[in-house]
Swiss-Prot record:
Gene expressing this chain: ptsH
Keyword terms, alphabetized: Cytoplasm, Phosphoprotein, Phosphotransferase system, Sugar transport, Transcription, Transcription regulation, Transport
Described function: General (non sugar-specific) component of the phosphoenolpyruvate-dependent sugar phosphotransferase system (sugar PTS). This major carbohydrate active-transport system catalyzes the phosphorylation of incoming sugar substrates concomitantly with their translocation across the cell membrane. The phosphoryl group from phosphoenolpyruvate (PEP) is transferred to the phosphoryl carrier protein HPr by enzyme I. Phospho-HPr then transfers it to the PTS EIIA domain.
Domain HPr: 1-87
Pfam families, A to Z: PTS-HPr (PF00381)
Sequence similarity: Belongs to the HPr family.
Annotated positions of the Phosphoserine modification: S46
Main location: cytoplasm
GO CC, alphabetical: cytoplasm
Subcellular compartments: Cytoplasm
Name the record gives this protein: Phosphocarrier protein HPr
């Protein structure tokens, strides 16, 4: 299992466009990937799950992956978070 903590700096938080990009990135991997926020965990491959969290600016989230490609998944998601200016 691999995980990484992120502090969301984007003014709009994880809104529709970056959420879609995160879901697309996560969906490339076979591992189970979750986004944890305020004690609630959702499947990062589910746009509805990600949007339901309402992650805003200043939030601390953890992304965890479990499976054969977990480490690669975390690296790719971290790159997406940085590229999109989320964290």
């Amino acid at each position: 299992m691999a995980s990484k903590d992120f502090h969301i700096v984007a003014e709009t938080g994880i809104h529709a466009r970056p959420a879609t990009l995160l879901v697309q990135t996560a969906s490339k991997f076979a591992s189970d990937i979750t986004l944890d926020y305020k004690g609630k965990a959702v499947n990062l491959k589910s746009i509805m799950g990600v949007m339901s969290l309402g992650v805003g600016q200043g939030a601390d989230v953890t992304i965890s992956a479990e499976g054969a490609d977990a480490d690669d998944a975390i690296v790719a998601i971290a790159e997406t978070m940085t590229k999109e200016g989320l964290a």
